[in-house]
Every structure is written in structure tokens, then in C-alpha cells.
Amino acid sequence: MKTAALLAVSWLCGAATVYSETDVEALAKKSQNPVEAMVSVPFQNNFNFGMGPDKEMGYNLNIQPVVPLSLSSNWNYIVRPILPILDIPLGGGRRKSGLGDLTLETFFTPSNAKSFIWGVGPMAIFPTATERELGNGQWDLGPAAVGVYMHGPWVLGALVTQGWSVAGESGRPGTAPFSVQPFINYNLPHGWAITTAPTYTADWRSDANDAWTLPVGGGISRTLLVGKQPLSLALVAYYNVDKPRYQADYQIRFSLTFMFPAK
């Protein structure tokens, strides 16, 4: 984890010689569009502080590739699996580590959209957690929708999902997970951007006092070329103004995204 933080600082502040390619600013905007027709592989490192009954640090790595599939000259199908790898404190010196539940978001989106891009499709959550404490033990299905507006230096929009349990492990309660992720990016020269993309979540079947997670915050991102490989890096921080009892008080996130634009 220390190595990841050092890489974040060194790459974000690295030598200007790797940023001279003329397409860096265009790639920056593409990296900010969750349904861009470009293969990308983000690695999202989340350092969560104040978790559990003893207010300890937890960590989760979200591996969330984006795979666009061309259906016709007018339509794309965007596939976005999200695989979490978790390490969480349980209190009393105990911890659990392993895979969490896999989320699959998919979107049908027009391929010829310009300044406004939208997409809708099905989403699913699979009970892939390797430990009981790392998942909900439910199979969830529901809709997903996204809208993106791009104008000048701005890339902004929101991604919304809603799931409902359709099956699950005996003895575990059903879930109805909802999430909305608004995102605002203001792009600066040389691939820099000011960014915020908090994810607000709720489970409509949870106790009302433990339903919502509401983070606020933001940070910076930079898109660059290392050799011929486009990368996007982001360093952001969020504070949870409302949250379930044992969720983190605040989070520091370092994201590294490998981009593979069509040639």
C-alpha cells in the first residue's frame, strides 16, 4: 500500500517529457466517460479510515475493466465488471481478507453521440465473496443508466444502478442496493483535471438509520503517456457525512487506469 502511494505522488508530479503527445487531453476526457467506446482497465485503490468497532483502517482494490462491444454502426454495448478485493477490520484485532461480491454493469449506448452520451442496460450482483463478512450472499438483478455531458473542459454526468435480490443464501436477508455516482471533471492543460466522483449508496431493505453512505470530496487526476501506453492517475479524498455504523469515516483513493484506444 505504501508503494502505491509513492507511485501516485511520483507519477502525478513526474517529468513533463512524458506528456508531450498531442492527444493526451483528448484521452483525459475519454478516461472520464464511463461508457467510452475504448477498452480500459482501472485499478481503484481505496484506503478506508475509521472502519469497524475499533475505528481501524480497511482497504479495498476494485478491478473494473471497461469492454465496449460494437453491435452495429449505431449501437455499442458497454460491459463493466467490478471485482472487489477486500481487507476489512472486524474489531478485537480480527480481520477478513478476500474477494467481495462481483458487480456487472452493462449499457446499450449510441455510437454516434457527441456532446451528450447516454446508456441503459441490465446490472447484476453475484455472491462471489470468499468470506461471509465480505459479501451479502445474494443474487441481485436490476437496471443501470448513465448520462454524460461533454462541453469544452467539462465532463460531467451520473451513473445510477438499482438491484433487488432474486435468490440468495439461506438465512441471510434480502437486499435492494441503490447507487448513484455523480461525476464532475474540469480539464486543465497537459492532461490535468480537477475531479469529483463520489458514490452515494443505500440499501432500501436496511434499517433507515443504517441505509445511506453519503461521501463528499474530490481531488486531481492526470493523463499521460509512458512510452506509448496511455495512463490515467487520480488521487482523491472523501468524507462520509452519513454512513452505516461500521463504515469508514473517510477514504483516500488512488486510481490507476490503463487505456487501450483504437488505432
Which stretches of residues belong to each language-model region?
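Bacterial N-terminal signal peptides
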Residues: A4-A15
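Transmembrane beta-barrel domains of Gram-negative outer membranes and organellar outer membranes
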Residues: Y19-K263
